[in-house]
Amino acid sequence: MAADEDELNLLVIIVDTNPIWWGKQALKESQFTLSKCMDAVMVLANSHLFMNRSNQLAVIASHIQESRLLYPGKNGGLGDFFGDPGNALPDCNPSGSKDGKYELLTVANEVIAEEIKDLMTKSDIKGQHTETLLAGSLAKALCYIHRVNKAVKDNQEMKSRILVIKAAEDSALQYMNFMNVIFAAQKQNILIDACVLDSDSGLLQQACDITGGLYLKVPQMPSLLQYLLWVFLPDQDQRSQLILPPPIHVDYRAACFCHRSLIEIGYVCSVCLSIFCNFSPICTTCETAFKISLPPVLKAKKKKQKVSL
């Protein structure tokens, strides 16, 4: 029991808040909106914090223009990257003790609700770049985990995992950054779980398979909370005792840099390792010119002229 209390379990939840996808979803199906998705995320966050007093939580919104740390907020200890990580509660909490609710849960709900409201209110869609910055959100999650890990005491063990709640489609433009983040998480023994709401994500399938996490495409979006509590609330030690969804077939095809399409056979630049579906004498990524080796030219043998006597 003492060993479990000394162990720090950090859960970082990344929520896809793409306003274009959620706007289309609200027009198509009013039963499942962003607010209901955030309610399910808050229940999962509260359950994680309530399971052990040493559990830690962070929530990141993956938007089209930024990746914002929703919780801990700006007033929280862990929200400030240069603050005291041991203080996760704000100095004042007027509503935390009125209804007898655990103060940490109340603070988490209030901070997440205020931050997500501020983020969606200030959203200004410009240009054609409307993809979710998922690679940047994963990088921010790894930086946050590293920052908390440095503040952990020497006699305390820390386990970290990342849960991605994905809504919009993958962005092939983020392929290289995404793969770099995946291998960085694997090196740090950080699990990446994925809960996909809409179409399957090949990038997240690879992330879960490489890091040892779970990948689940939700069959019914209004039942999101049930899947979050059933599949993603248990940590990596508890999962071995549960019957979880079976592993899926992972699509390991790479995306070419010229058309951003998945290919099985392609051409790889020997300098920057960019992948192309068609041969090009000059790499469009690093502008390296390749020397094309031509087959050797065989000199024709001179015919011996017969000398007539």
UniProtKB/Swiss-Prot annotation:
Report C4-type zinc finger ranges: 269-286
Q: Where in the cell is it found?
A: Nucleus
Per the record, GO CC terms?
Answer: core TFIIH complex portion of holo TFIIH complex; nucleus; transcription factor TFIID complex; transcription factor TFIIH holo complex; transcription preinitiation complex
Q: Return the Pfam families for the record.
A: Tfb4 (PF03850)
Q: Does the keyword Cell cycle apply?
A: no
Summary of the function given for this chain in its UniProt record: Component of the general transcription and DNA repair factor IIH (TFIIH) core complex, which is involved in general and transcription-coupled nucleotide excision repair (NER) of damaged DNA and, when complexed to CAK, in RNA transcription by RNA polymerase II. In NER, TFIIH acts by opening DNA around the lesion to allow the excision of the damaged oligonucleotide and its replacement by a new DNA fragment. In transcription, TFIIH has an essential role in transcription initiation.
Summarize the subunit comment: Part of a TFIID-containing RNA polymerase II pre-initiation complex that is composed of TBP and at least GTF2A1, GTF2A2, GTF2E1, GTF2E2, GTF2F1, GTF2H2, GTF2H3, GTF2H4, GTF2H5, GTF2B, TCEA1, ERCC2, ERCC3, TAF1, TAF2, TAF3, TAF4, TAF5, TAF6, TAF7, TAF8, TAF9, TAF10, TAF11, TAF12 and TAF13. Component of the 7-subunit TFIIH core complex composed of XPB/ERCC3, XPD/ERCC2, GTF2H1, GTF2H2, GTF2H3, GTF2H4 and GTF2H5, which is active in NER.
Report the protein name in the record: General transcription factor IIH subunit 3
Q: What is the native source organism of this protein? A: Mus musculus
Upper lineage ranks? Answer: Eukaryota, Metazoa, Chordata, Craniata, Vertebrata
What gene does the UniProt entry assign to this protein? Answer: Gtf2h3
